[in-house]
């Protein structure tokens, strides 16, 4: 019984504001009136059940409900704010209502009064026959095409909780040129409804002549917000020709209450398409262009920064204990290859080989994924793959191919000088190149015991401890250690000077014993000791540290722990 065509109706949201001749005792400087109506005085009561205005919480009875026309609220105040407006439909099915975040801005003294109008086009797709008749009675257009739905679905699909926050920033961006206010008003309008019809919201602002006001212009001295509800002197009638006033960013009493209880709208039911604002020429040049641009940049940069914090966070850099805070950001582990790919591509655009082709051995997140799998897959307790000459080659059961070739190349180079080997090994295999180019990745701590820091960070083998937790901070933590024989002078600095051959042999042996260590209380002691040095890196599944970054005192303590475990 549902009609197959879409019906479009229009709503006009607007407000008027003027400076009072004399401020009230509460300090209110403006009288304002906000309204919802049909275009050209069409009777929207046919399909509108009620309109709810959510005023700022400082007003008495901030929730104002209008069940009959005129749907308007008149008040006095001294600053603008974002005013959520909910229009409830006389519809037995969804959508039952739509919500708009309206920017009720005021103006500076000495400028023309605000006379602002914003048009909303709501397109209901396949309404019920009963609701369709109501829409048509109110002047709905039954022949409206639905081609705009795709372009505006993002607006309609935003949840109303997020819309209030986006509207506050977008409303500030709408405070200048005519082109900017259409985009701001489109993002500040959000929908609240649920299912079977799609409402396309075409949203225009026809503002009048005006003056957009400076951010700081409306900040009254801090005063109590206990406002008495004052009916303002009546404004000019609603059908008066409209003038536009430029929107004032952030002129709120405080922050409007976000109405976040709305259900998440279905973009297939109601779409709200934004149109261009129509404005009369303003009497003075807009003064808020720079504000509007900066607000847009702030909004954009905040979202970019959020993405970058996940996509290019430095989980691969061994710094100091400051890196511990990365444990809290668990989501960076879930980013997987995306994080590494974006980080690498920033450093060396498309010159890197695809990570999928190189088995991702240098990807810490992939290591972590492998480690979680191989807890069940790998029966061998010492499953540490290594890129060095020491006797761990048989344990390379997971990472093969290019990694094995690195190990062989390095095996033949073991007796050369450190500085020479660093240069030679830069070209050992394709897998090393992303690490060398990545710069910050060359200091990734991993399980390597006989290679320069670049190739060892490329191989980044893992050792899997038993499932019970080794650390207080995380449940299934895995210990990763690295004791390179050859290392780049620019990458690591050893406190007691260059490692001599004997000391490095000790480190290799220490590494081997650490990899076979199974006593949990000893492992916990080691973790506690390394934590004191600050030379470690924690991921969701591993506790990584570099033996060469530790001083000899700490190394001796590690050896003593292992001696204890050997005798026990």
From Swiss-Prot:
Tissue expression remark: Enriched in undifferentiated hematopoietic stem cells in fetal liver, cord blood and bone marrow.
Which superkingdom, per the lineage?
A: Eukaryota
Q: Where is this region: Histone H3K9cr binding?
A: 78-80, 106-108
One Pfam entry for this protein is AHD
UniProt-annotated site: KMT2A/MLL1 fusion point (in acute myeloid leukemia patient F1), residues: 481
Q: How changing residue 59 to A affects the protein?
A: Strongly decreased binding to crotonylated histone H3. Decreased binding to acetylated histone H3
Sequence position, cross-link Glycyl lysine isopeptide (Lys-Gly) (interchain with G-Cter in SUMO2): 339
Q: Which UniProt keywords apply?
A: Activator, Chromosomal rearrangement, Chromosome, DNA-binding, Isopeptide bond, Nucleus, Phosphoprotein, Proto-oncogene, Transcription, Transcription regulation, Ubl conjugation
Q: Where is this region: Disordered?
A: 138-475
Chain positions found as Phosphoserine: 288, 294, 412, 419, 483
Record remark on domains: The YEATS domain specifically recognizes and binds acylated histones, with a marked preference for histones that are crotonylated. Also binds histone H3 acetylated at 'Lys-9' (H3K9ac), but with lower affinity. Binds crotonylated lysine through a non-canonical pi-pi-pi stacking mechanism. The YEATS domain also binds DNA.
Functional description taken from the UniProt entry: Chromatin reader component of the super elongation complex (SEC), a complex required to increase the catalytic rate of RNA polymerase II transcription by suppressing transient pausing by the polymerase at multiple sites along the DNA. Specifically recognizes and binds acylated histone H3, with a preference for histone H3 that is crotonylated. Crotonylation marks active promoters and enhancers and confers resistance to transcriptional repressors. Recognizes and binds histone H3 crotonylated at 'Lys-9' (H3K9cr), and with slightly lower affinity histone H3 crotonylated at 'Lys-18' (H3K18cr).
* Protein name as it appears in the record: Protein AF-9
The organism encoding this protein is Homo sapiens
Q: Taxonomically, what lineage is the organism? A: Eukaryota, Metazoa, Chordata, Craniata, Vertebrata
- Name of the coding gene: MLLT3
């Amino acid at each position: 019984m549902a009609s197959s065509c879409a019906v479009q109706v229009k709503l006009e949201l607007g407000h008027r504001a003027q400076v009072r001749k004399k401020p009230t005792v509460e300090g209110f400087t403006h009288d304002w009136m906000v309204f919802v109506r049909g275009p050209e005085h069409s009777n929207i009561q046919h399909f509108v059940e009620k309109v709810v205005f959510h005023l700022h919480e400082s007003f008495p009875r901030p929730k104002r409900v209008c069940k009959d026309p005129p749907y308007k609220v008149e008040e006095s105040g001294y600053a603008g704010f974002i005013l959520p407006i909910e229009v409830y439909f006389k519809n037995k099915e969804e959508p039952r209502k739509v919500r708009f975040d309206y920017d009720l801005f005021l103006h500076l003294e000495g400028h023309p009064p605000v006379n602002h109008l914003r048009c909303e086009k709501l397109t209901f797709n396949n309404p019920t026959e009963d609701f369709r008749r109501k829409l048509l009675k109110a002047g709905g257009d039954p022949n409206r095409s639905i081609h705009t739905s795709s372009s505006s679905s993002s607006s309609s699909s935003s949840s109303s909780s997020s819309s209030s926050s986006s509207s506050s920033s977008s409303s500030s961006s709408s405070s200048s040129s005519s082109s900017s206010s259409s985009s701001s008003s489109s993002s500040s309008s959000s929908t609240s409804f649920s299912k079977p019809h799609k409402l396309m919201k075409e949203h225009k602002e026809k503002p009048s002549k005006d003056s957009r006001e400076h951010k700081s212009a409306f900040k009254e001295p801090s005063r109590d917000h206990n406002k008495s509800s004052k009916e303002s002197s009546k404004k000019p009638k609603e059908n008066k020709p409209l003038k536009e006033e430029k929107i004032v960013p952030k002129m709120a009493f405080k922050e409007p209450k976000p109405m976040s209880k709305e259900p998440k709208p279905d973009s297939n039911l109601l779409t709200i398409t934004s149109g261009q604002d129509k404005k009369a020429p303003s009497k003075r040049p807009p003064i808020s262009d720079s504000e509007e641009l900066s607000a847009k940049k702030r909004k954009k940069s905040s979202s970019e920064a959020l993405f970058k914090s996940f996509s290019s966070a430095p989980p691969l850099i061994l710094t100091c204990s400051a890196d511990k805070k990365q444990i809290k950001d668990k989501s960076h582990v879930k980013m997987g290859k995306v994080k590494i790919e974006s980080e690498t591509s920033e450093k060396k655009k498309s010159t890197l080989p695809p990570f999928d082709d190189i088995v991702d051995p240098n990807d810490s997140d992939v290591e972590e994924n492998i480690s979680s799998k191989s807890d069940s897959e790998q029966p061998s307790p010492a499953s540490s793959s290594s890129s060095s000459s020491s006797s761990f080659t048989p344990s390379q059961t997971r990472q093969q191919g290019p990694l094995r070739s690195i190990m062989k190349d390095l095996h033949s180079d073991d007796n050369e000088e450190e500085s020479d080997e660093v240069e030679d090994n830069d070209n050992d295999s394709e897998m090393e190149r992303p690490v060398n180019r990545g710069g910050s990745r060359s200091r990734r701590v991993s399980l390597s015991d006989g290679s320069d820091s670049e190739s060892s960070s490329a191989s980044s083998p893992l050792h899997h401890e038993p499932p019970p937790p080794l650390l207080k901070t995380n449940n299934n933590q895995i210990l990763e250690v690295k004791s390179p024989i050859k290392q780049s002078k620019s990458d690591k600095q050893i406190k007691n000077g260059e490692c001599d051959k004997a000391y490095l042999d000790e480190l290799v042996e220490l590494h081997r014993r650490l990899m076979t260590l199974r006593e949990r209380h000893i492992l916990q002691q080691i973790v506690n000791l390394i934590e004191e040095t600050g030379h470690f890196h924690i991921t969701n599944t591993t506790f990584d540290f570099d033996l060469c970054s530790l001083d000899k005192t700490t190394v001796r303590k590690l050896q003593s722990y292992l001696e204890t475990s050997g005798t026990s």
